[in-house]
Design a protein with these regions (language model features):
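Ligand-binding pocket segment of bilobal, Venus flytrap-like solute-binding proteins
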Residues: 160-162, 166-240
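Positively charged n-region of N-terminal signal peptides that target proteins for export
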Residues: 1-5
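Hinge/capping helix and adjacent helix->loop/strand transition within the periplasmic-binding protein
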Residues: 84-93, 107-194, 243, 248, ...
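N-terminal (or domain-start) structured segment
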Residues: 27-116, 179-206, 297-300, 322-327
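Extracytoplasmic/secreted proteins, especially bacterial periplasmic and envelope-associated proteins
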Residues: 51, 55, 59, 63, ...
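Bacterial N-terminal signal peptides
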Residues: 9-22
């Protein structure tokens, strides 16, 4: 009888402890945030990604009632910052502001984790990518590139930053239009600036730019935008057809979102998503994103954002099959 009573008491105590812990976690989630939030941006200061996250976060902190402190943590192909957040306490006070590079880094063999190592909070913006030629090139639109390659096998030069967004862009583009990668020359550059210089010098045939990197050159006629990798035409390039209008079934963008460490309570994720969603309703914020940074506001949270990430990673994985990351 004493043993039975002891077992019962132990069980009750254990259940009470579990209940107490659950109540404590719920209380913590309901009290969130209890301190300033650290937003790790795994890139250097001053770039479009850094500025966009800072801009939106300054507005989001009004809703949260605490400061969101951006921390630039560049290095190791943006994996230094992502790993730091991945290994942080899942209490909502350390976040990651990043984009497709999370999946790209795993596909390139740089790390062993991808989107599934985090809790997705919200997609915020997309910067639409644009295949581009110099103004003197005979190709007038993206649907002419495949024929041009077939007419000049092994001679056509496409620029890219190895293992980066544009590397995957061209792999996916070649797959969609039926270009064999053995028939083209992929020329690697360390950054976008050097690709701009190479296209200005006509050392390459094609590059992948967007409005932040190529807008001024599109406007003055130095570069020719060959299509827009987005379901709809861009306000900044109303006369440039989408790739889908040209018969190329692909969209491609740099999709920026906010992530939390795995295990962060849903209530906290919802609170953060709501704050960032409210920030994107501000007309000044939206105007700067669209007009200064050539990006589009696209807000997705919860299951919708998870579905977007799943589709994004599947498309990148398919493109990765055509990439030799060792060369």
């Amino acid at each position: 009888m004493m043993r039975t009573t002891l077992c019962l008491a132990t069980t009750v105590a254990a259940l009470s402890l579990v209940s107490s812990l659950n109540l404590t976690n719920t209380a913590r989630a309901n009290d969130f945030p209890t301190q300033d939030i650290r937003l790790v941006i795994p890139y250097g200061p001053g770039g479009a990604t850094d500025i966009i996250f800072r801009l939106i976060s300054q507005e989001a902190e009004r809703d949260l009632g605490v400061s969101i402190v951006p921390v630039n943590m560049a290095g190791a192909g943006a994996t230094l910052g992502s790993r730091n957040v991945k290994d942080s306490r899942p209490d909502g006070h350390t976040l990651l502001g990043s984009h497709d590079t999370i999946a790209l880094s795993k596909l390139a063999g740089m790390v062993d984790y991808s989107y599934d190592a985090f809790e997705p909070i919200a997609l915020l913006t997309q910067t639409i990518n644009i295949p581009t030629a110099h103004a003197n090139h005979e190709v007038q639109s993206a649907d002419q590139i495949a024929d041009y390659v077939r007419e000049n096998p092994g001679q056509v030069r496409f620029s890219m930053i190895p293992s980066s967004t544009d590397h995957f862009f061209w792999a996916q583009f070649f797959q969609e239009v039926g270009i064999d990668m053995a028939d083209v020359r992929l020329v690697g550059y360390p950054d976008t600036g050097e690709q701009v210089s190479a296209l200005l010098a006509e050392e390459i045939d094609f590059a992948m730019f967007n409005l932040p990197s190529g807008g001024a050159f599109f406007e003055d006629g130095t570069f020719r935008p060959l299509g827009v990798a987005h379901p709809e035409r861009l306000d900044g390039l109303p006369d440039v057809a989408t790739l889908r209008e040209l018969g190329i079934d692909m969209d491609h963008s740099t999709s920026r979102g906010i992530f939390a460490p795995k295990g962060t309570p849903q209530e906290i994720l919802d609170t953060l998503a709501e704050a960032y969603g409210q920030a994107l309703e501000d007309e000044t914020v939206r105007s700067r994103i669209e007009n200064e940074f050539g990006s589009v506001v696209r807000f997705l949270a919860g299951e919708d954002y998870q579905a977007f990430l799943d589709e994004n990673e599947a498309a990148l994985s398919a493109a990765a099959e055509n990439i030799d990351f060792q060369n």
